């Protein structure tokens, strides 16, 4: 956690596991009964919002935890209005994907501001974003609630490792 500027951190079995844990944490929180209930999300907020240009194969990690993927960014109005309009009582989190080929017309800070206005956490997939080392702290500093990094790739650790960092109540 100290290297990311986050309240808490956890070594996970790869960045994909970090995405699964992000979804589970945002849906079940610290409630032991809800944690054991997953992937059955009955009675829980279970939608993860993802920007249309951020759709990717690793969404299965969120779905494995029981989440439903809801795309935003194809409607009328500004992107900020579209994101705000996509958030509802079933929204567990908004995900933001960083990496080559994943442009976003809203900055992470803008997404965080909109999501937090609705009391919805923002989770970041930063698996491919190391180096530079500055990214270890950037996403938390920009307001993300949870961030996942690959322990392989630029970190040069074992390919089967990852880092999950963020709010203590979600890690």
Where are these regions (language model features)?
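A glycine-/small-polar-enriched, mobile loop at the entrance of the PLP active site in fold-type I
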Residues: 1
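Conserved PLP-enzyme active-site core in the AAT-like
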Residues: 5-12, 16-171
């Amino acid at each position: 956690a100290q290297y990311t500027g986050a309240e808490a951190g956890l070594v996970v079995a790869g960045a994909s596991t970090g995405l699964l844990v992000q979804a589970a944490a945002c849906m079940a929180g610290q409630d032991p009964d809800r944690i054991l209930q997953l992937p059955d999300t009955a009675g829980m907020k279970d939608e993860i919002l993802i920007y249309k240009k951020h759709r990717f194969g690793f969404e299965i990690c969120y779905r494995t935890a029981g989440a439903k993927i809801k795309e935003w960014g194809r409607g009328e109005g500004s992107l900020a209005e579209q994101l705000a309009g996509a958030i509802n009582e079933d929204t567990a989190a908004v995900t933001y994907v960083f990496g080559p080929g994943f442009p976003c017309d809203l900055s992470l800070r803008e997404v965080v501001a909109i999501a937090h206005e609705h009391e919805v956490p923002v989770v970041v997939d930063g698996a491919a974003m190391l180096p530079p080392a500055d990214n270890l702290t950037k996403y938390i500093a920009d307001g993300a609630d949870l961030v996942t990094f690959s322990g392989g790739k630029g970190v040069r650790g074992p390919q089967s490792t990852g880092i999950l960092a963020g709010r203590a109540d979600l890690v």
